[in-house]
């Protein structure tokens, strides 16, 4: 009999599900994911493909200098999450909630197998006449890991070690988390195993909106997020708060968002539109997708409540606006500059 994970204030007990059910794994494969080990996964990013075939790129390339064609998009927790967000493009109706896998795969195994999975997905581009040979060879050897693809990555108990394994291989790393596992961040701080850039996705300005938009699977999710934001403040790494904005749902109260952002005092804030894609189309309508102008106007309203921040850049194809802290060097790299240090 499987035991359920119990998530209590300040503690996570991991027991449970030995493997991903075959029907769930098959659903992901149909969506062009490669399953890695027991619980991880890889999928080629839309912008990686566009970079190879059309020379276009992701907003993270424009904002931070990440090379879209050399990005490995992966997750160590493919089908498990603490939220059921209405805007999620993943097949969360088939997610396994917080019933976590055990035993967990080794971090080094996940990294090596993720690189192999990426190459398996890339092989079809090798003979494509639209793809530059040198660019394909670079894509074959990724240098950046976006740990964010699906599920809540911080549920993986060895996240610090996973980051370290990527860094050993010369990768830069982004983690995108919903902020509900602050104890994982505490461990990573103690171990000094932080990612190159840490994102927290904040998609509600208050607990009422949180309950209706994020539909938490845990009883104290909001309190956990507040703790996570406090831990982010003054971290010795690059930090971002990302707002995924859904028209008619969470695109209100910029002053409340600002209070949350100032708890973390991140280097960057991204105001980004919800995109009407994937499984979210079963829950929302195209009218919930803000225009770039809507996002720009919301960012302008938000920054009025963020002393020490300004609008730095925007990228219309992704409907995203970059807000940056005033003390970040717009030409610099690393923990004091706008751009990633490769």
Curated annotation (Swiss-Prot):
Q: Name one Pfam family in it.
A: Wyosine_form
Which UniProt keywords are listed? 2Fe-2S, 4Fe-4S, Cytoplasm, Iron, Iron-sulfur, Lyase, Metal-binding, S-adenosyl-L-methionine, tRNA processing
Q: Does the keyword NAD apply?
A: no
The GO annotation for biological process reads: tRNA processing
| Enzyme Commission identifier(s) | 4.1.3.44
Query: Which InterPro entries is this protein grouped with?
Result: Aldolase_TIM, rSAM, tRNA_wybutosine-synth, tRNA_wybutosine-synthase, TYW1_archaea
Specify which residues bind [2Fe-2S] cluster according to the UniProt entry for this protein.
45, 58, 71
Highest taxon, organism lineage: Archaea
Cofactor needs: [2Fe-2S] cluster; [4Fe-4S] cluster
Q: Does the keyword Ribosomal protein apply?
A: no
**MF terms (GO), sorted A to Z:** 2 iron, 2 sulfur cluster binding; 4 iron, 4 sulfur cluster binding; metal ion binding; tRNA-4-demethylwyosine synthase activity
What does the record say about how the cofactor binds?
Answer: Binds 1 [2Fe-2S] cluster. Binds 1 [4Fe-4S] cluster. The [4Fe-4S] cluster is coordinated with 3 cysteines and an exchangeable S-adenosyl-L-methionine.
- Report the catalytic activity: N(1)-methylguanosine(37) in tRNA(Phe) + pyruvate + S-adenosyl-L-methionine = 4-demethylwyosine(37) in tRNA(Phe) + 5'-deoxyadenosine + L-methionine + CO2 + H2O
* Annotated residues for binding of [4Fe-4S] cluster: 81, 85, 88
Q: What Gene Ontology cellular component terms go with this record?
A: cytoplasm
Assign the protein's first listed, main location to one coarse class. Answer: cytoplasm
Q: Where is the Radical SAM core domain?
A: 64-312
Localization, UniProt: Cytoplasm
Q: Which family does it belong to?
A: Belongs to the TYW1 family.
**Record's function text:** Component of the wyosine derivatives biosynthesis pathway that catalyzes the condensation of N-methylguanine with 2 carbon atoms from pyruvate to form the tricyclic 4-demethylwyosine (imG-14) on guanosine-37 of tRNA(Phe).
Quaternary structure annotation from Swiss-Prot or TrEMBL: Monomer.
State the protein's name: S-adenosyl-L-methionine-dependent tRNA 4-demethylwyosine synthase
Gene name, per UniProt, is taw1
């Amino acid at each position: 009999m499987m035991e359920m994970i119990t998530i209590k204030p300040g503690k996570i007990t991991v027991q449970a599900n030995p493997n991903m059910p075959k029907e769930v794994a098959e659903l992901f494969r149909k969506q062009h994911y490669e399953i890695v080990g027991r619980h991880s996964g890889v999928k080629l990013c839309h912008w990686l493909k566009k970079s190879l075939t059309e020379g276009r790129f992701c907003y993270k390339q424009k904002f931070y200098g990440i090379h879209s064609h050399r990005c490995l998009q992966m997750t160590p927790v493919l089908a498990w999450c603490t939220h059921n967000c209405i805007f999620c493009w993943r097949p969360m109706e088939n997610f396994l909630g917080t019933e976590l896998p055990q035993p967990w795969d080794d971090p080094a195994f996940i990294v090596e197998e993720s690189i192999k999975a990426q190459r398996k997905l890339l092989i079809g581009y090798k003979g494509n006449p639209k793809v530059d040979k040198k660019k394909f060879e670079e894509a074959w050897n990724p240098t950046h890991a976006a740990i964010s693809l699906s599920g809540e990555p911080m549920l993986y108990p060895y996240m610090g070690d996973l980051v370290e394994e990527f860094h050993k291989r010369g990768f830069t790393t982004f983690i995108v988390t919903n902020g509900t596992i602050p104890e994982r961040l505490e461990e990573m701080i103690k171990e000094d195993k932080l990612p190159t850039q840490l994102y927290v996705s904040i998609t509600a300005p208050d607990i009422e909106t949180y309950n209706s938009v994020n539909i938490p699977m845990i009883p104290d999710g909001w309190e956990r997020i507040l703790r996570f934001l406090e831990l982010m403040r003054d971290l010795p790494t690059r930090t971002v708060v990302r707002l995924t904005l859904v028209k008619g749902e969470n695109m209100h109260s910029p002053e409340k968002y600002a209070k949350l952002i100032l708890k973390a005092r991140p280097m960057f804030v991204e105001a980004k539109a919800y995109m009407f894609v994937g499984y979210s189309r079963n829950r929302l309508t195209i009218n919930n997708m803000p225009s770039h102008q809507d996002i720009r106007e919301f960012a302008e309203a938000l920054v009025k409540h963020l002393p020490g921040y300004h609008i730095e850049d925007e990228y219309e194809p992704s409907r995203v606006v970059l807000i940056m802290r005033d003390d970040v060097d717009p030409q610099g790299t690393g923990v004091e500059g706008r751009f990633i240090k490769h």
